């Protein structure tokens, strides 16, 4: 077993090293067709006209918040917040956000999605029809609500605990278990070794409602 872990560690470190080298050597220039600006609240925006696919727009909001920012008693809250963005906002309470998106052709899980990583959380709305300007306005309102106005209803929080628990269970492959054991070796005395976004289920199952609200704020 020890020999297996040594081999796995070497393979993983080699893969990460190659990835870092590729990132360092490939600096992608900024597209001159992209409009870049910064709002008074600190939000940096990027806008680019795109004719493909024709008649559709895409919206993304990337937040520099990931699992690396969590304390030990918060492990999994960044990912939990990502899930809660689809369970009620000020402008779209309950399941209204998903229902409205589906009504205009934006499919949940395909066009409407998000992910949490160690260093960031990214939400996206794609395949947005541009024929009606009001639809684009509503998508911008959704981005606003995600950043500022989640309801974080207690019943919705409790319902989502089991959803995330099932997601965790589905991820517990042999490769994932090896990864969890290798990361602390690769990153000793660092949060990077202990901050997989899914978190730990003891926190997910038992955190107080206010803990999630405080983390959001």
Name what the model sees in each region.
Residues 24-61:
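Mature N-terminal segment immediately following signal peptide/propeptide cleavage
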Residues 1-7:
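Positively charged n-region of N-terminal signal peptides that target proteins for export
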Residues 58-126, 173-174, 178, 194-200, ...:
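M16/MPP (pitrilysin/insulinase) zinc-metallopeptidase core fold and M16-derived inactive scaffolds
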Residues 23-35, 123-126, 133, 141, ...:
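Histidine-acidic residue clusters that define the catalytic metal-binding segment
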Residues 94, 98-102, 150-169, 180:
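Acidic/histidine-enriched alpha-helical segments
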Residues 91, 125-160:
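M16/insulysin-pitrilysin zinc metalloprotease superfamily fold
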Residues 7-19:
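Bacterial N-terminal signal peptides
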């Amino acid at each position: 077993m020890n020999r297996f872990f040594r081999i796995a560690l070497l393979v993983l470190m080699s893969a990460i090293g190659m990835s870092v080298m590729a990132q360092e050597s490939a600096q992608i220039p900024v597209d001159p067709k992209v409009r870049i600006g910064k709002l008074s609240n600190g939000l940096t925006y990027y806008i680019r006209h795109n004719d493909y696919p024709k008649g559709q727009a895409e919206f993304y909001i990337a937040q520099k918040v990931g699992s690396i920012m969590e304390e030990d008693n918060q492990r999994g809250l960044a990912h939990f917040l990502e899930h809660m963005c689809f369970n009620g906002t000020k402008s779209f309470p309950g399941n209204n956000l998903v229902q409205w998106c589906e009504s205009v052709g934006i499919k949940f899980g395909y066009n409407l999605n998000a992910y949490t990583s160690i260093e960031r959380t990214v939400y996206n709305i794609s395949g947005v029809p541009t024929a009606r300007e009001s639809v684009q306005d509503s998508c911008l309102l959704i981005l606003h609500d995600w950043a500022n106005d989640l309801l974080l209803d207690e019943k919705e929080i409790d319902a989502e605990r089991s959803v995330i628990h099932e997601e965790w269970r589905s991820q517990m492959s042999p490769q994932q278990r090896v990864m969890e054991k290798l990361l602390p070796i690769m990153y000793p005395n660092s949060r990077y070794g202990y901050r997989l976004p899914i978190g730990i289920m003891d926190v997910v199952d038992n955190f107080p409602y206010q803990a999630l609200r405080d983390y959001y704020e």
